[in-house]
Each structure stands twice: as C-alpha cells, then as structure tokens.
UniProtKB/Swiss-Prot annotation:
Catalyzes the transfer of the diacylglyceryl group from phosphatidylglycerol to the sulfhydryl group of the N-terminal cysteine of a prolipoprotein, the first step in the formation of mature lipoproteins. GO terms for biological process: lipoprotein biosynthetic process. It is a multi-pass membrane protein. InterPro entries: Lgt. Pathway: Protein modification; lipoprotein biosynthesis (diacylglyceryl transfer). This is Phosphatidylglycerol--prolipoprotein diacylglyceryl transferase. The chain crosses the membrane at residues 18-38, 55-75, 89-109, 203-223, 235-255.
Length: 279
C-alpha cells in the first residue's frame, strides 16, 4: 500500500517572531476543560465558585516549574555540561510526574491558606486532572514525540487507527507505537470511571484512585516508550514512581478507612482544613 503522508506541523501559527505550537494550545484546552468540569463539582459541593482560580493558577505554575526541574535532575549529566539549556524550555523537556508533585504541593499550600479541605478539593479536581492529561497527550502527537518503539504500518492498520494518526507516526523513516494514544484513551477512561464512582467513595479516595489508575497505565505504557528518563540502565524513573504512587495511594485508602472512617464524598458540604481528624 502506498503512503499518503499528511505531515502535521507542530507550529500552529506565527505571531511575528513568536511561534505558537499546537502543544501549548492543546495543553491550554485540556486545562480549560478540566476547569469547567471541576467547577460543576465545586458548586455542587457548596464551595464558592472562585475557589478553584488560585488553586489552578498556582498548581499549574509550580507544576510546570517542577516538571522542568524534575526533567533536568534526571538528565543532569547533559545539563551540567550545558547549563544555559536549563532555562530553554522551548527546546523541550518536562516530566509529568514532576508536574504532579509540584502541582500537589502548591495545591495543598493554597488549601491551607484558604482554609479548604485538601481531600475534598483533591476529589473535586482528580477527574479534571486525568482528563487534562488525556487531552494533553495529543500535544505529544503534534510534536511527534513521546512515542513507542518501531512497528510496521500493517500493525498500526490492524489497530483501525485513522490515517492521519498512522501517517504521523511515520517519523524519520520508521513507524512507531502511538503511545500518546494509548495513554490518552487510558486517561479518558479513567476520567469516565472517576466521575461515575466518586459519589460512592469516601472523602479523599477519588484522588487516591486517580493516582492509582493513572500510575497503572503509565507503568505499562512507559515500557513501550523510547524516550524514558532512566534511573539506571534497566530502571525507568516513571515506572518506579508509578509503583510507589500505587502503593502509597492504596495504603492511604486502607489506613484512612481504618483510622478515620471518613464520610462519603457525596454526603458532605464545604469542609475546612482538617484539624484533629483527617476527614
């Protein structure tokens, strides 16, 4: 079968000397959609409609910074020799786990300052986070990055993928696993599940199940990728972090049920920062 190659330009348009890339546009769309989804849950929980503004702003800002720092740390031999590249984020190089860590810390701090319950806020935003991640992976597709190992065109056709995906997985003379798509589908499925089971879960468990679901998918999909950050020659950083997140999340669900028996997410109104008992 002949190849009809419809290459997608990573640059959406130019504003003078500034190139606006599809990656940034798609990330922004993911954040906005996530915001609107979380906003509905926020109002339903009885919280002020402006509550999410500061949380999203600081979590996104510090999440982005942490994502870059995380990437630089695990690529330190290169950046030690090229320190000027550290701030050149437009050359690529961020890591989602770093973003999650930075965003989590910032979110908890904002909750403390605003006297909000971090478990309740976590449950509200968890489906939005994984939805934004699922959308954001299409930014990797537009950049022709974060793909898996080599495959044949016949393999991709057997997946019944649209031609524009198949054709844009042809990179430098070789077809590759569309790992962006695998993770996007996994994340969107996680979003659907979390939204539908949240009302049946206890406070805090939606967020922990988000971490568990995302980490399970990331562990297996990461094994297909060719651009993984490596801790050693055999250990991928993302897989190790995924295992830790799964263990920590499940342990916290069990511990909190035994120790505190928190209420159902759907049975509480607006909650303050926890004091004696973590609810």
């Amino acid at each position: 079968m002949g190849i009809v190659f419809n290459y997608i330009d990573p640059v959406a348009f130019n504003l003078g000397p500034l190139s606006v890339r599809w990656y940034g546009i798609i990330i922004a769309v993911g954040i906005l959609l996530g915001y609107f989804v979380a906003q509905r849950a926020l109002v339903k929980a009885g919280l002020h409609k402006d509550t999410l503004v500061d949380i999203i702003f600081y979590s996104a800002l510090f999440g982005f910074i942490a994502a870059r720092i995380y990437f630089v740390i695990f690529q330190w031999p290169y950046y030690a020799e090229n320190p000027s590249e550290i701030i050149k984020i437009w050359h690529g190089g961020i890591a989602i786990h770093g973003g999650l860590i930075g965003g989590f810390i910032a979110g908890v701090i904002v909750c403390k300052v605003k006297n909000l319950n971090p478990f309740q806020i976590g449950d509200i935003v968890a489906p939005s986070i994984i939805l934004a991640q699922g959308i954001g992976r299409w930014g990797n597709f537009m950049n022709h990055e974060a793909h898996g190992g080599p495959v044949s065109r016949a393999f991709l056709e057997q997946l019944h993928l649209p031609n524009f995906i198949i054709e844009n997985m042809y990179i430098n003379g070789q077809y590759y696993h569309p790992t962006f798509l695998y993770e996007s589908i996994w994340d969107v499925a996680g979003f659907i599940i979390l939204v539908n089971i949240r009302k049946h879960l206890k406070l805090g468990e939606t967020f922990f199940l988000y971490l568990t679901w995302y980490s399970i998918g990331r562990f297996f999909i990461e094994g297909l990728r060719t651009d993984s950050l490596m801790l050693t020659s055999n250990i991928r950083v993302a897989q190790l972090v995924s295992i830790l997140l799964i263990l920590i999340s499940i342990s916290l669900i069990v511990y909190r049920r035994i120790k505190y028996n928190p209420p159902l997410y759907s049975k509480v109104g607006a909650l303050p920062w926890p004091t004696k008992k973590v609810k």
